[in-house]
Amino acid sequence: MEIVDGSQRLRTIRDFMADKVTLRDLETIPAANNFRFSDLPNSRQLKFAETPIRVIILDNTTDAVTRTEMFARINTGGTTANDAEVRRGSLPGPFMNLIIELAKDPTFVALTPISPQLVDKREREELVTRFFAYLDSFDPTLNDGEGDIATYKEEPRRFYFSFVKERNDRIAAELDSGGISPTIDAMRTDFTSTLDFIKAVSPHGFTKSETGNQVPRVRFESIAVGSALALRVDPTVVDRVSDMTPLLSSNEFSDVTRSDAANVKSKLLNRIRLTRNWLLAQ
């Protein structure tokens, strides 16, 4: 059995109970500084030894998605890794490399002014992941032509994870067979053309104002994915639309980009379709 999370803490506890280490630099209980385990009263030693430790065992049959779910749940102390960080660590591959690359794209950075803290938490990688997951999973032929994301079951963590894994595998297979990946080329083109369009028609990029330093995910999804879908249907949207302000300042846009219950499928589809339909109607 291999300890994959918490190994250092468990070894420290073991060594303390074996009298191999001495307590140092304690702040909460400074009176215990310079104590070894054997220096504690017998009753305290017994209580320490009988304190339960929660252990979760994942066997070889546990799938990758479940592993990620479990790591997210057990990582409840200290600094918790968010979903983007967990995916980055557990899903290495060519698509993940593309996500990391595009998250640093100068145009994308300019259109998504966020705090250094959010940058450190991989927020831009989260936005790039959502862009591709929703865009490439959207089937415009479903739901009487309104389009749908059939694989989205209101479990966003599993949805994003499964999408990244599938794209990693697909792109790796393409690279292995021919040395090039049409999928990567198409995704990079979609991303770049969408950013160029948003830069031209949205005065404040993905923010709400000129001085804005926040990019609400629901706002980003509506603008980015909706625009990309419209460009796929009719590339001449680039020539016909010069300003998205009438849409972005409308009550309808405000309504569909509220953050409450944002992961509900109907709300996700409504905010994506609104931008797409508005652009195509111009």
Positions of the model-derived regions?
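Basic- and aromatic-enriched surface patches that contact anionic nucleotides/nucleic acids
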Residues: 1-162, 238, 242, 246-247, ...
